[in-house]
Amino acid sequence: MKKHIIYFLMLLPAVFIASGCQKYETGNPPASTVANFTFSTSNSGKAPCVVTFTNTSLNAAGYLWDFGNGQTSTEANPTATYNTPGFYTVKLTCTAVNDVYYNQLVKTAVINVRDPNAGLAQVLYYTTCATAGGAVHMVVLNDDGIAHVQDFAPVTLVKPYGITTDTSNKKVYVSDYSVNAIYRFDADGTNPLKILDITIFPALDAPEGLMVAGDKLYWGQPGGIYRSNLDGTSPELYKSSIDYPADMHYDPVGNKIYAVVDMEDGTGGYFSMNFDGSNLVNHIPGVDGLAIEVNVATGKAYFAGYAVAGTAMPDNGIYTSNIDGTQVQKIGEYGLKATWGVAIDDKRGKLFWSFKNSNYAPDGKIIRANLDGTGKEDWITGINPQAMQAVWIKL
């Protein structure tokens, strides 16, 4: 009997140990919180761009984002806008569901917003009229403020009212209202090629405003916005909701089109719409816009307006407004004849516009001023300027 008691006492601790081990191994620990995210950028990661964040965190009760640009958010999947090149440290802090030591509540990542102008030259391209025919010119902008004009290879032009650039492929496009043609040049003004005329596209009619978006060229003419491939092939009507865009501006970040509409052959007005044609808004009805430039970074739009009594632009002149069309004000004169030229030097905060007193005589000039119209100077004189655009491009 004594022997059995000894055996029982020896086995008793083992029973308790086995029971304790079994309970520990089969239990479930509280779930941890793990912060994590991925992101994608618009505009190929070049400023300005929008970064979209996708939250992949586990078991979180809340979120606090610090985007490194002065902005924060508590949304699960936010977006952030970066207007300036640089490195930005993004920090996501999650609120834990359970207070356990193995939570991972913070995730950081560095976003490199690239400089879109690195290795590029800033160039003002513009067209002119003359009795002997129209022409295209360029000026490389620099800090000395001196206009060193270079001429493009000659082509047949009479009223070159539209100009735009394809910076990705280093090309310049010019439309002629009178000749019914669109030409393409290399960025340095060489290798001219007529890519569209009425023999190629019989519907081509008095093309004016031009813009490039992606792999397409867009232009305005009676009937709406038309487009083709960048080499002029496959021309077609794109959108008829704006009846005659005299000039257009494409915002790649917001994916929007801004346009002014000719009053003589169209309904007039300053419009914006999503790139797919949705959300069409007439911000300034009835105005006769000839040229437009939009500065998305400052929230301002600039126009060459032809006088229409009873509208926000009752006199000929250069106007500015907020992008939504509010606070319209006149900031300059463009002479006795209508002009199709407005451009912005975004590096130096300058505005250019065409000034002319006749249709063909060299009695005009390009005026340069501050963005509010102050500090005007006659920058290039003895010309008859028409359309213009300032861009960063590789020559």
Cite the ranges covered by each PLM segment.
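Surface loop/turn motifs at the tips and blade-to-blade linkers of beta-strand repeat domains
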Residues: 151-158, 195-203, 238-243, 282-287, ...
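Short coil/turn segments that connect the beta-strands within blades of beta-propeller domains
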Residues: 121-123, 168-170, 214-215, 253-255, ...
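Extracellular/lumenal mature domains of secreted and surface-exposed proteins
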Residues: 4, 21-120
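Repeated scaffold domains used in trafficking and secretory/extracellular systems
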Residues: 158-164, 204-212, 243-251, 287-295, ...
